Amino acid sequence: MILEDTADFLAALPSMRSLMGLDLGTQTIGVAVSDTFLSVATPLETVKRRKFTLDAARLSDIVAQRRLGGLVLGLPRNMDGSEGPRCQSTRAFARNLDKSIGSDLPITFWDERLSTVAAERALLEADTSRKRRAEVIDHVAAAYILQGALDRIRVIRAEQDQE
């Protein structure tokens, strides 16, 4: 089930389940996971894109193995905030993945503008070699996307606790 609003997404999440963050590219999918308390995102792996059915099967395996409670997909908005063809492609991927997984797994989107730039900068600061950066950039970017969503979830929970 695809939910646009983060608060609705949070309400639909099962308790004590981790989330998976995805950074969709044309050739790869960066994958990151959170802890069960939804506080920290960790890069997991980069999936080499082939056919959708194979990609969906791999992501479905990760969801099942880790008993994940929801998915956060990076939404590649234009710098002015508008949605272009890449956003449409991401939304189509989410719809197809939702059908493919065939469960009531909540799916939401998170603005991924500059996530790859931030990931690249962090890897440069960590003095990572060019070869290693190329290997890990996608799942590190997925962790940045997921961490942004987790930070928003923390704010929503704090606001709910004050009410």
UniProtKB/Swiss-Prot annotation:
Query: Which cysteine residues pair off into disulfide bonds?
Result: none
Note whether Lyase occurs among the keywords.
no
EC number(s) per entry = 3.1.-.-
What is its subcellular localisation? Cytoplasm
**Gene Ontology terms describing biological process:** rRNA 5'-end processing
Q: Which CDD domains match?
A: YqgF
Q: Say if the entry is tagged with keyword Nuclease.
A: yes
A GO cellular component annotated for this chain's UniProt record is:
cytosol
Instruction: List UniProt keywords, sorted A-Z.
Output: Cytoplasm, Hydrolase, Nuclease, Ribosome biogenesis
Top-level EC class: hydrolase
> Sorted alphabetically, which Pfam families does this protein's record hold?
RuvX
For molecular function, the Gene Ontology terms on record are: nuclease activity
**Main function:** Could be a nuclease involved in processing of the 5'-end of pre-16S rRNA.
Give the protein family: Belongs to the YqgF nuclease family.
- Protein name stated in the entry: Putative pre-16S rRNA nuclease
Give the taxonomic lineage as stored in the record.
Answer: Bacteria, Pseudomonadati, Pseudomonadota, Alphaproteobacteria, Rhodobacterales
